[in-house]
Amino acid sequence: MFAVENGLQGDPRLKAISDAIRVIPHFPKTGIMFQDITTLLLDPVAFKHVVDIFVDRYKHMNISLVAGVEARGFIFGPPIALAIGAKFVPLRKPGKLPGRVISEEYELEYGRDCLEMSVEAVKSEERALIIDDLVATGGTLSASINLLERAGAEVVECACVVGLPKFKGQCKLKGKPLYVLVEPNQFDELTL
C-alpha cells in the first residue's frame, strides 16, 4: 500500500520526500533509473518526515523489533525503532556478523544474494517490522521475512521509502502488507 492510498494523499511531507530524492539515469548500468536517497539524507527536514510518517504508522502496533536490511535499512531503522520503543536488528550480507547466524539466499533480477541474522537477535513471537529504502522485485524483503519467521517472529509489515511502480513482488511477500511512501513516477507529478 502506498502512503497516498492510506490517507496521506496531499500530505506536503510526501512532496518534500519526493523532491529530496535524486534520480540518476543509467546507474549502475544502462536502463536503470537509480533512486538516490543520499540527497534525502542531506535534507534534515525531508529525512525527519520519513521517520515521522513511519513512527506515526507503527507507534501503536506493538512492534517489538525493527529489522533493517543492509545497508540503507540501517539508516531508517534505528531512529524508527528508538521512537517506537523497539530494538533494532540488522540483516546483513554474509560474513559481516559475529557469532552464530542463520542465512537466507534469494533471487535477484540477475543472480543470487544472501542475508544473515544473529540467532540471538530474535525471540519467538516478537512482532517485527522490516524496513528498507526501496522495493523493486521483493526478493530482499521476502528473504527478510523468511529469516525472521524462521527465528519465530511474526512479521507485521514491510516498509520502504520508495516503491517501484511496476513492483510485482508483493506476491513474494507471503501475504505480508507492504507500506511505501513514494514511487518514482510521483516525483514528476508532485513537482508540477
UniProtKB/Swiss-Prot annotation:
It comes from the Eukaryota. The keyword Glycosyltransferase applies. One of its GO terms (biological process) is purine ribonucleoside salvage. Pfam families: Pribosyltran. It is found in: Cytoplasm. Pathway: Purine metabolism; AMP biosynthesis via salvage pathway; AMP from adenine: step 1/1. HAMAP family: Aden_phosphoribosyltr. This is Adenine phosphoribosyltransferase 2. It comes from Arabidopsis thaliana (Mouse-ear cress).
